[in-house]
A protein has these predicted regions:
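Residue-level signature of mid-helix packing/kink "hotspots" within the transmembrane helices
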Residues: 35, 63-71, 130, 164-165, ...
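Extracytoplasmic gate region of multi-pass secondary transporters
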Residues: 37-38, 243-299, 357-360, 364
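C-terminal ends and interior cores of transmembrane alpha-helices
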Residues: 91-111, 327-340
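Hydrophobic core of transmembrane alpha-helices in multi-pass small-molecule transporters
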Residues: 96, 109-131, 332, 343-358
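Cytoplasmic helix-loop-helix junction between adjacent transmembrane helices
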Residues: 121-160
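Helix-loop-helix hairpin linking two adjacent transmembrane segments in secondary transporters
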Residues: 156, 160-209
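A late C-terminal transmembrane helix in Major Facilitator Superfamily
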Residues: 298, 368-403
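C-terminal transmembrane helical hairpin of 12-TM major facilitator-type secondary transporters
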Residues: 315-362
Length: 434
């Protein structure tokens, strides 16, 4: 394949950043098409006659499918390449969003059958969304040099938070005018657009992209560690990822952080409408502000992690943003749960999500550093545990709310944030699985 020429020995092309842009757009669309259910919750629950605990089962279905297919998603991304896998799953996002809109109502199905139908569809939605971040992880490790992963990972995570912000405004507005079914139908084509764009422009390896010049290729490869680009033929190589102590501690820490994340993902909009008694459209704008704050936190966390890794090394450079982010999010979550003034509580919860997302880039950079050439699998293990915690959240939060009230349900996340700090202190990002 003809390589793009470089006009200057020091002037590299910027194809890697265009690849990152499409990845960020993919994470944006993925989050629009997975958070839509949370923002449709009050309307759907009323229309379909579901209680909070029954709705928790529906939410758990997504995270069950997402968790089960995380590790296989990492394996698929490493084996078949990010280009094929992301294209296929993006088509799946679109199709299953359409299917969600077709779930029958109370006039056709009993409550049990409605829950079963929603559970089945949302399980499949979780399954096809599961590979996105392991695949993104594997793509970034191919396209960016060692020591420069946290910033692109943080920027890619910014796409997901902006997707949540967009859905928080768009979904309630469309529902107010046309109903929840039309909202799902209108969003479905976004998945097809991502599939087309990614297949057309991306390549699994920088060397295979005709627009990458020699200078950019040398920049990407110049700082790789020995062995990073060598593919292992050992059949049991994947088992080392599952058995590695640092990967397991990282999974437990990231899982703890994600309990707080799932309070936002699953329940924040519902909490604003049903507990704090905001109008749905107002709650949408507040939720959007929270997701935008998360986007800023994700971008800052990635940049900060790269800077700290350069000064302190991988071990503490990846730890410090997580320690600060988790401690601050725990404190702000308690303020949001216990303060009686809605404006103060909401402000604290918005800031809580900023600090929660400060951790995203550092966590994924750690998974890449620890995973080495098995970065996709390491990311899959980490995110599998995180989404098992999503199932716990979907079932535990409404149970706590029913028995102890919503204050206790929201505040429970602070304990998990503290656990996340303790587990992260046991992770060493400066040693790999190999």
């Amino acid at each position: 394949m003809k390589r793009a020429s470089s006009t200057s020995a020091s002037k590299a092309t910027a194809i890697r950043w265009r690849i990152l842009l499409i990845l960020a757009l993919a994470s944006f669309v993925s989050y629009v098409l997975r958070t839509n259910l949370s923002f449709a919750a009050p309307e759907m629950m009323a229309d379909l006659g579901l209680s909070e605990i029954q709705w928790g089962y529906v939410l758990a279905a997504f995270t069950a499918g997402y968790a089960i297919f995380q590790f296989p998603g990492g394996v698929l991304g490493d084996r078949f390449g990010p280009r094929r896998v992301l294209t296929v799953i993006a088509v799946g996002w679109a199709l299953l969003t359409l299917v969600t809109a077709l779930v029958p109502g109370r006039e056709a199905f009993s409550t049990t059958l409605i829950i079963a139908a929603l559970f089945g569809v949302r399980f499949l939605v979780g399954a096809v969304h599961a590979p996105i971040f392991p695949v993104m992880n594997a793509s970034i490790v191919r396209w960016f040099p060692v020591g420069g992963w946290a910033l692109p990972l943080g920027l890619a995570s910014t796409g997901l938070t902006l997707g949540g912000a967009a859905a928080a405004i768009a979904v309630p507005l469309v529902i107010a005018g046309f109903g929840w079914r039309i909202a799902f139908l209108a969003l479905a084509p976004l998945g097809l657009l991502i599939a087309v764009a990614w297949w057309w422009y991306s390549r699994d390896e920088p060397a295979d992209h005709p627009a990458v010049n020699t200078a950019e290729l040398e920049l990407i490869r110049g700082r790789q560690r020995v062995g990073d680009t060598v593919e292992s033929d050992e059949p049991l190589a994947w088992l080392r990822v599952l058995k590695n102590r640092d990967v397991l501690m990282l999974m437990l820490s990231y899982s703890s952080m994600n309990f707080v994340f799932y309070i936002v993902f699953n329940w924040f909009f519902y909490y604003l409408v049903e507990v704090r008694e905001f109008a749905a459209t107002d709650a949408g704008f507040i939720s959007s502000a929270q997701w935008i704050a998360g986007a800023a936190g994700a971008a800052l966390g990635g940049w900060l992690c790269d800077r700290l890794c350069g000064r302190l090394g991988l071990r503490w450079g990846c730890r410090w943003p997580v320690i600060v982010g988790m401690a601050a999010s725990a404190a702000l979550l308690l303020v949001g749960a216990f303060h009686g003034t809605p404006a103060v509580a909401v402000t604290a919860l918005v800031l809580c999500f900023f600090f929660n997302q400060l951790n995203e880039g550092p966590y994924w950079a750690t998974s890449v550093a620890v995973g080495g050439r098995h970065a996709g699998a390491a990311g899959g293990v980490m995110n599998t545990g995180a989404n098992v915690m999503g199932i716990v959240n979907a079932l535990l939060v409404p149970l706590l709310a029913a028995r102890l009230g919503w204050t206790a349900a929201i505040a429970s996340g602070a304990a998990f944030a503290v656990l996340g700090i303790l587990f992260m202190l046991l992770v060493r990002a400066d040693r790999t699985v190999d």
